[in-house]
Amino acid sequence: MIYMDNAATTLQKPEEVKEAILYALEHMGNAGRGGTEAALDASRSIYAVREKLADFFNAESPTRIAFTANSTESLNIALKGLFQPGDHVITTVLEHNSVLRPLYWCQEQGVELTILNCDEKGNLSYEEMENAVREKTKAIVCTHASNLTGNMINLKRVGQIASKKHILFVVDASQTAGVYTIDVQELEVAGLCFTRHKGMLGPQ
C-alpha cells in the first residue's frame, strides 16, 4: 500500500511510539493523583515529555507546555480565552475550521475580526497584514501551512510584525510541527498549537 494521507494522520508510527504506548498501558498510573510508584512513573514521564517539547520548540520553560486532547481543543482554549469584546484580531482565509470557528464565536461576543485574503496562488500580502493592525488589535492568528492548498506562511515575517506592533502571535502548526523547524522564541510566537498524530508521529 502507498499511503499519501500523512497530512491527515501518519499511519506508520515508529516502533518506539508503539513501545511507549504499550509501556504506558501496562505500567503507568494516574499522574498527579497519588504516591504509588505507578502514579509517580506517569508524572515523571509527563514532565520528561514537557522538557523534550520545550527543547524541541525552544520554549522558555517546560512549564510553558500544556497538554490537551488535540490541536482543535488547544486552539479553542487559546482563542476563546485570549480575547474580550472590543479586541481586534487578524487572521487569514487559509485557516482551518479549528481556527475560524472559535474566532467566529469570538466575533459573536463582540471581538472585531479581520480576515486577510490571498492572491490566486494562495500567497498573502504581509504589507496588507501590517496595515491591518489597529489600536485595539490584540493578536495575529494564522496557520503555518494550509491543509488544503499547502501554502505556507512566513512565520518569521509575521512574528516581526507582531513584535513591532506589540501584539500577540498565535500559530496553528498542526501541519508542520515535527516536519519543519519551529523556534518559538526566534519567531516570537506567543502560542503554538499542534497535534501529536501528524508530523510528530504520535498516536491519534
Q: Which role does the model predict for each range below?
A:
Residues M1-Q204:
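Pyridoxal 5′-phosphate
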